[in-house]
Amino acid sequence: MNIKLTQKAVEWFKNELDLPISNKVLQFYVKYGGEFQLKQGFSPAFTVENKDAIDIGFEQTFYEINVVIAEKDLWYFQDEKLTVDAIDHEDEIIYKRN
């Protein structure tokens, strides 16, 4: 598993979600459906959660933002290379398979 946040994505998360926040993490998880699919029928999504509330399976820090994936969601991201980016003019996060 390889997850990369671009500098644009990091700035977007900092501005839109007020990260970093003490004891809070940016959690990527699996949702049903969606436009971008690493595995058929499922898409990545994100939320901000208390670090203590998650059974962490993956953790990495990008420019002060702690990114985690719960143990239960590792199956989706395993064996994948994912870049998380932001589109300036649309003010949204996008995902790219490497």
Swiss-Prot record:
UniProt-listed InterPro entries: HesB-like_dom_sf, PdhI-like
Top-level taxon of the source organism: Bacteria
Recorded family membership: Belongs to the HesB/IscA family.
Protein name: Uncharacterized protein SERP0923
